[in-house]
Amino acid sequence: MTERRIIHIDMDYFFAQVEMRDNPKLKGKPVIVGGKASSRGVVSTASYEARKYGVHSAMPMSQAHKLCPNGYFVTSNFGAYRETSAQIMSIFRSYTDKVEPMSLDEAYLDITELVRPDLPASKIAQYIRKDILENTHLTASAGVSYNKFLAKLASGMNKPYGMTVIDYQNVHDILMTLDIGDFPGVGKASKKVMHDNGIFNGRDLYEKTEFELIRLFGKRGRGLYNKARGIDHSEVKSSRVRKSVGTERTFATDVNDDEEILRKVWELSGKTAERLNKLQKSAKTVTVKIKTYQFETLSKQMSLRDSVSSEEDIYNIAYLLYNDLKDP
């Protein structure tokens, strides 16, 4: 049986990153997303600069203001977050149809079928993170392992913009020394019960019997028993089948020079061909989409008699479609 390879991608301080990308004046500043400092809401996301002051998600905005009075308090812009998230999920689905989004900024990918001797899971994770950075100008952290639990654990170990691989060689050492509060799914209430029963790290959890953990946590006890051993049989639950492969880019400033745009079309044609090649697929339809400075989306597509997969073929069709869009 082929060993599963799962990637967990978690965007770094996603809401705050989007705000800093869309407003460069915020870059490097303590950004706190959620609302005005005087509001009665809670913090959605805080940049790492704000976290140095002790600000964290779900904290009351008033408390965040006390800790970081010079912070930049930003009202959540869910339209921008959803649009960027859709772009990221599209990148995931250009690699595999086995994608399970967990929120706007994180997802599991089962890439077992893509892994080859010359293309390990870690390299695929690097490609995905690179695509996210090039397409959205945002960073993501990744965890790679043989099950979902360990992949999620790994994605949080080297944030921001890091990647960790947990395999059979290092899993025991990682789990045994892990603080119990760092186990995914262990919240404040569970942590208190753990501490009250002498469980402070993975080794303490490992040494408890399944019966003891069920007595303390009910049905969850069996899951905790398995987690201490790195066991998780849950599948990546995908709800969509990928039918397209594509690449998008957003220019830093408005561009109306044909030569510059076509250079980018050539680059994107190459990226798309590269993805098709990795997936050993070809295309029967080519689509070009343009978003204007007024945020109007224009698109044209061409269905083909013979499928294409090369950079040149994709570019030649995209070139025709671009000219049709430019001069309808």
UniProtKB/Swiss-Prot annotation:
Database matches in InterPro entries: DNA/RNA_pol_sf, DNA_pol_Y-fam_lit_finger_sf, DNA_pol_Y-fam_little_finger, DNA_polymerase-Y, DNApol_IV, Rev_trsase/Diguanyl_cyclase, UmuC
Site (Substrate discrimination): F15
Subcellular location: Cytoplasm
EC number(s) per entry: 2.7.7.7
Any one Gene Ontology cellular component term annotated for this protein: cytosol
Active site feature: E106
Keywords: Cytoplasm, DNA damage, DNA repair, DNA replication, DNA-binding, DNA-directed DNA polymerase, Magnesium, Metal-binding, Mutator protein, Nucleotidyltransferase, Transferase
Top-level EC class: transferase
A biological process from GO: DNA-templated DNA replication
Chief location of this protein within or outside the cell: cytoplasm
Protein name according to UniProt: DNA polymerase IV
